């Protein structure tokens, strides 16, 4: 009995993410068959996959592969590489301080940060709170797992688990709609300055609420407002009444 006729080695590949959770909602992940299931892995799956190799071998009268008598190996063709504009340090900083802000402000629906090169529009960092490890994408956070475990009905538990998994995989920064809000205060200030309507030292008073056409608009400062402030201070405070004025 020649044992070599019965033992062979099959090569396989598996995607590994050395940085664990870093940029996980951007990168996404692949399944057991290396097919992209989320993020850029899914979007560019055809470009990244390449062409699978194969082994062609003869069979004997019993239907057993004659791998060492006749065998032809067709090599796999590698897929394309995808190079991102993300900067690993910028990405790390985005994720670190986003997590701090989400905890301090007790955000329930996850936060997001996008850092761009203002000259080219290149994305340098894109972070979403409540991310995951793409090496084990089907593992929920401790908090979400506790939520699932608290459900007794198996059908409801399965549905909740699927909901929470899809939520942690979802890239909120590009998949959810978001009203720009305070982001446009920069443009409001720029237009007012350019047209000579205000200067950096123009003053505005914030008493928390400002009435326009009978409708009250509130400042995010719940301690009675920012009081009298310059345009520069109003920008720093992101004061709603000041920019309405």
What are the residue ranges of the model-derived segments?
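Short pre-catalytic segments that frame enzyme active sites
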Residues: 66-78, 88, 92-180, 215
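Surface-exposed patches in mature extracellular/periplasmic domains of secreted proteins
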Residues: 8-12, 103-116, 200-203, 245
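Active-site SXXK
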Residues: 26, 93-97, 121, 177-204, ...
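Sec-exported extracytoplasmic/periplasmic mature domains
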Residues: 31, 49, 95, 99-103, ...
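Extracytoplasmic/secreted envelope proteins and their assembly/folding machinery
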Residues: 23, 27, 37, 41, ...
């Amino acid at each position: 009995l020649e044992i070599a006729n019965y033992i062979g080695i099959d090569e396989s590949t598996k995607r590994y993410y050395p940085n664990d959770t870093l940029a996980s909602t951007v990168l996404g992940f692949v399944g057991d068959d290396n097919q992209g299931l989320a993020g850029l892995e899914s979007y560019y799956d055809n470009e990244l996959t390449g062409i699978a190799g194969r082994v062609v071998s003869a069979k004997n009268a019993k239907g057993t592969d004659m791998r060492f008598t006749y065998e032809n190996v067709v090599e796999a063709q590698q897929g394309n590489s995808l190079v991102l504009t993300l900067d690993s340090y910028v990405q790390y900083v985005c994720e670190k301080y986003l997590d701090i802000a989400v905890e301090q402000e007790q955000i329930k629906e996850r936060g997001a940060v996008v850092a761009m090169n203002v000259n080219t529009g290149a994305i340098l960092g894109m972070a979403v709170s409540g991310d995951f490890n793409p090496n084990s994408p089907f593992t929920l956070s401790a908090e979400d797992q506790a939520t699932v475990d608290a459900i007794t009905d198996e059908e409801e538990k399965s549905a909740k688990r699927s909901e929470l998994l899809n939520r942690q995989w979802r890239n909120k920064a590009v998949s959810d709609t978001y009203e720009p809000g305070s982001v446009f205060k920069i443009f409001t200030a720029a237009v007012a300055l350019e047209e000579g309507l205000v200067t950096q030292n123009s003053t505005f008073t914030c008493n928390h609420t400002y009435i326009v056409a009978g409708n009250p608009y509130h400042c995010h400062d719940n301690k009675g407002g920012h009081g009298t402030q310059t345009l520069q201070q109003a920008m720093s405070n992101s004061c709603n009444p000041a920019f309405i004025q």
